[in-house]
Regions:
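Insoluble glucan recognition modules
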Residues: 1-199
Length: 199
């Protein structure tokens, strides 16, 4: 109706009444109702567990356009659902049963990760009704600091401890190779390597 969100908007209407199709309708006086529409925040996809309970984990849609991205720390075969800001709950397509295809129908199953626990970069696209998981088994540092980073799964963060001889600037590069899982690979058929390109 073209109303402004988060402020009261007057909506005007009249009621029509008639006792039969062959009768002329009688109209009420104009009635004014103040309606305050609100904007639904569609920027977050809330990760639910297999019982559809909140987990505190979210994916982010920068443009609020139905594409949710983010890192997740998952155990092997972890099961989950995703809920949008408008309450729509997404799971795996229960009709085809194909992994990584999405559905918001009652027949949907939970999503599930492949059989490796660790760090995943998740891309869930409700418009394409498909999601993917880029498994990141390890990250290494090269440059002024060199070594292998450790993934803290419960807190979803990579760390590397080192001692600096003095205050100042250092330059390093983070490197890693990921395994992409999507509807074309299933949960155990990934044969693709993806350079993460994190610098």
């Amino acid at each position: 109706i073209g109303a402004n969100p988060d402020v009261a908007n007057n909506v005007y209407f009249r009621l029509a009444a008639q006792t039969g199709k062959n009768m002329i309708p009688v109209y009420s006086n104009v009635v004014t109702v103040a309606v305050t529409p609100y904007t639904i925040d569609m920027s977050l996809g809330y990760i639910l567990n297999a019982d559809k309970a909140e987990t505190g984990v979210t994916l982010y849609s920068a443009a609020s356009d139905g594409q949710y991205l983010g890192f997740m720390g998952a155990t092997a075969w972890y099961n989950f659902f995703m809920k949008e800001g408008d309450g729509t709950v997404w799971g795996n397509d229960g009709v085809t049963g194909t992994a990584f295809l999405m559905s918001s129908e009652e027949s949907s199953w939970n999503f599930w990760f492949p059989g490796m626990g660790g760090c995943y970069y998740v891309d869930a696209n409700t418009n394409k009704k498909a999601w993917s998981a880029l498994y990141i088994p390890s990250l290494t540092l090269t440059g002024d600091v060199a070594g292998t980073m450790t993934f803290d799964r419960p807190n979803v963060k990579w760390t590397y401890a080192f001692s600096a001889a003095q205050a100042g600037n250092i330059t390093f590069k983070v490197n890693g190779t990921g395994r992409l899982y999507d509807s074309s690979t299933g949960t155990d058929g990934s044969d693709s390597d993806a350079n993460l390109g994190i610098e």
